[in-house]
């Protein structure tokens, strides 16, 4: 059952669905010095070079490990490039195939698609520069392939609904659940694997995991009359979280992502 049948979408929010065809090119990168980071920043700021299909880029710098169950190296930066419909033909050679500039070591590159009803941002999203207490949570998740359908159902019917409420209440900046569609490159030392990435801007002080946040958000109004902790317990049996980090936002040139929802323009509330 679609989430639309029991929850109307607040007019201050955009929820990007798979049929909106938002495509994300993600790169996990290790940089050697500040000059190399400056090169990444310059590329993210000048994202328009990738043409009309590109909706922007964002760049995050690693700050701390929240949870780790992998021996793979911890990369210094994550870069997300957003496209409508398909990745621009210029992007993959520059970002993946060609030799990278000095000091930039590519560890993994992949194509991501949105998880059903679980990619939520405000209509007026302009980044989190005005919320210095927030950090960017990046959760790397491995779902057993045979359970992907069940995972999407739980994300759509419970996690996505809770995320909408938390973004609407400004508890979270955005909540962006994405699924790996294709791995374009993986360095030999990258032994860790995942097939989902969840991004969320939040205040880490007092944060004790999404399960508790989502359960509290759904405590009053339960989807399908199911106890939220039961639904979230299902996730624990079908997925692992090899790594979960907190990061600083270096570049957030991604406000145009909301424009991929062409069929439902945002309404501004005063």
Enumerate the predicted regions with their spans.
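Short S/T/G/P-rich N-terminal loop/turn motif that feeds into the first structured element of a domain
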Residues: 1-224, 229-270
């Amino acid at each position: 059952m679609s989430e639309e049948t029991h929850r109307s979408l607040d007019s201050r929010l955009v929820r990007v669905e798979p049929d909106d065809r938002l495509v994300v090119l993600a790169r996990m990168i290790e940089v050697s010095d500040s000059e190399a980071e400056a090169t990444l920043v310059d590329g993210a700021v000048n994202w328009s070079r990738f043409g009309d299909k590109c909706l922007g880029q964002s760049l995050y710098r690693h700050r701390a490990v929240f949870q780790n169950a992998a021996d793979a190296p911890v990369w210094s930066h994550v870069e997300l490039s957003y496209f409508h419909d398909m990745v621009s033909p210029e992007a993959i050679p520059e970002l993946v195939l060609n030799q990278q500039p000095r000091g930039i070591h590519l560890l993994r590159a992949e194509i991501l698609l949105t998880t059903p009803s679980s990619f939520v941002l405000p209509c007026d999203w302009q980044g989190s520069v005005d919320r210095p207490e927030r950090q960017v949570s990046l959760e790397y998740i491995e779902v057993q392939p045979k359970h992907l359908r069940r995972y999407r159902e739980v994300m759509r019917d419970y996690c996505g609904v809770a995320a909408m409420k938390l973004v609407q209440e400004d508890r979270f900046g955005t909540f962006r659940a994405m699924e790996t569609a294709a791995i374009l490159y993986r360095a030999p030392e990258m032994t860790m694997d995942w097939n989902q990435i969840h991004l969320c801007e939040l205040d880490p002080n007092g944060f004790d995991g999404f399960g508790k946040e989502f359960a509290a958000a759904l405590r009053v109004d339960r989807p399908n009359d199911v106890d939220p902790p039961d639904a979230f317990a299902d996730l624990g049996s079908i997925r692992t979280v090899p790594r979960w980090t907190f990061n600083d936002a270096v570049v957030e040139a991604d406000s145009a992502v909301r424009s991929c929802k062409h069929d439902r323009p945002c309404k501004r509330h005063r």
